[in-house]
Design a protein with these regions (language model features):
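N-terminal amphipathic/basic leader segments beginning at the initiator methionine
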Residues: 1-23
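Gly-rich Lys/Arg/Thr-decorated short loops/hinges at beta-loop-alpha junctions or inter-strand turns
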Residues: 2-3, 38-54, 73, 116-142
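Gly/Ser/Thr-rich loops at beta-strand to alpha-helix junctions
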Residues: 13-14, 39-41, 83-91, 171-177, ...
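A glycine- and small-aliphatic-rich helix-loop capping segment at beta-alpha/alpha-beta transitions
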Residues: 51-56, 87, 93-102, 125-130, ...
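Catalytic or ion-translocation cores adjacent to nucleophile or general acid/base/metal-coordination motifs
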Residues: 100-116, 179-220, 224
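Active-site cavity-forming subdomains of large catalytic enzyme subunits
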Residues: 102, 106-113, 117, 121-169
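A conserved active-site cap/scaffold subdomain adjacent to cofactor or substrate pockets
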Residues: 196-295
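C-terminal non-catalytic interaction/assembly regions of soluble proteins
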Residues: 285, 298-435
Length: 435
């Protein structure tokens, strides 16, 4: 019988189903429980939490750990997660408290060092420009609040090699929480590229949780039930081949279609880059091998790129939005009149960095109900100076309620204060400078 490592995923984002962790360990045999919580947006959420509550990690993960800790330790199920976010040490300390409260002896490990904010000036002086992948801008003029390198799998493998029962990760690649345990189980070397590429494919497929089990699937009518959609398990073999399945009795579907859809998720070219290996997705084979069982084999890998990706977040301008509902005839003309009046009331468009105007035509001709009778005029004001926004701006818009076009009604928006935006800044760093 082929030896496999059963890696289960219980989370695809911060806010995913809380009881999925317990469901995965109670529903059948698994060897490793993983969870991915760190979308790029999540980093900004954790930054704000760290500023206000001194946390910076995914607090709901602690509830999941408490629910599964005894079972996992008793059955030697490892836990690997990136829920450490911006504070993996703090998360590890909280996990240790949970084990102590439960009277459990377990080894808790955490990975650190992804935060390069303290080193940014030295790195830039050494030639790192951190050029924005999307815009080509240089980071030098930006106001940086977070900067985290996407680590690979080898720190996770080392922690497991040293007997860790749970590994708390910071900003690692989504697939690293799967590659690391597989490399540990089968003792892969850094140049076992085909095996690593297979594990990368497995990690990429199960990283989004229930999404590869029928969630967000375009051909949704193929899915037997969307009640209690199951979460995925990757049964990984020594050569990197794997079979994706889910626990019996759960909803959803594991098919060639659902796995192919997830494989193509966030992919630009068939060469999928990771700090540990490049997986060539045009080499692999996908086949249905049973009910809710799909095997992926033959993935070829090559040496990793010379750079690591970095997730930077910078302080952007301030924004404030409002919406007004327009009804009746001549919607475009009404929108034009309303916009002219509001810009006049507040002293002109030129004082803002930008004014974004969208006319959303959700209205129907000769509507049967009020809900389909209106269009929405959405106005977003952008300013580097926060004094340009706030209560006065909102008041000037409110004043038009009885003094402008017929059939208009406000629908709120950004409230009475313009909020500062945190802007995602994707870039690279020379891998030789990653510690």
């Amino acid at each position: 019988m082929v030896e496999v490592l059963r890696v289960a995923n219980c989370s695809g984002f911060y806010g995913d189903r809380l009881d999925a962790a317990k469901e995965m360990i109670d529903g059948g045999p698994v060897d490793v429980l993983t969870g991915d919580y760190l979308a790029e947006l999540t980093t900004t959420i954790l930054y704000n939490q760290r500023q206000s509550r001194n946390t910076g990690y995914v607090g709901t993960f602690l509830k999941q750990v408490k629910a599964v800790a005894e079972h996992c330790v008793a059955n030697n199920i490892k836990i690997v997660s990136n829920a450490g976010g911006l504070n993996p040490k703090g998360m590890a300390e909280e996990v240790e408290k949970i084990y102590e409260e439960l009277g459990i002896t377990a080894k808790v490990a955490y990975i650190d060092g992804d935060d390069i904010v303290p080193d940014l000036k030295d790195l830039q002086a050494g030639g790192e420009t951190f050029t924005n992948i999307d815009t080509g801008e240089d980071l030098a003029a930006a106001d940086v609040v977070t900067a985290n390198t996407y680590f690979g799998a080898w720190g996770i493998k080392e922690a497991l090699d040293n007997g860790a029962d749970i590994v708390i990760c910071p900003r690692v690649t989504d697939a690293a929480v799967v590659i690391g345990p597989a490399a540990w189980k089968f003792n892969w070397a850094r140049d076992d590229y085909d095996a690593l590429a297979g594990a990368l494919a497995a990690g990429h497929i199960i990283e989004c949780g229930a999404q590869c089990c029928g969630g967000n699937y375009a051909f949704f009518e193929e899915v037997p039930s969307y009640r209690d959609v199951g979460y995925p398990i990757a049964e990984i073999e020594a050569d990197g081949s794997f079979t994706v399945t889910k626990h019996p009795g759960t909803g959803g579907l594991v098919s060639v279609g659902t796995i192919s859809a997830q494989l193509l998720y966030e992919i630009s070219t068939p060469a999928y880059y990771n700090p540990d290996v490049v997986a060539h997705f045009d080499t692999l084979k996908i086949e249905q091998v049973g009910d809710d069982r799909v095997r992926v084999s033959g993935t070829r890998g090559s040496n990793p790129p010379p750079t690591h990706k970095v997730c930077v977040n910078t302080r952007g301008p301030y924004k404030q939005s409002t919406e007004v509902l327009l009804t009746g005839l001549d919607i475009e003309k009404k929108a034009e009149i309303y916009l002219d009046a509001i810009l006049h009331n507040i002293g002109g468009r030129e004082q803002f960095d930008d004014v974004d105007v969208q006319l959303i035509r959700s209205d129907h001709e000769d509507p049967d109900t009020n809900e389909v009778s209106h269009a929405a005029l959405r106005i977003t004001f952008v300013a580097s100076d926060p004094s340009k926004l706030g209560r006065l701006l909102q008041a000037k818009m409110t004043e038009l309620g009885l003094a402008n076009i017929p059939g208009n009604t406000g629908r709120g928006g950004g409230g009475y204060s313009g909020n500062q935006v945190l802007v995602h800044w994707p870039c690279f760093i020379d891998s030789k400078k990653v510690v």
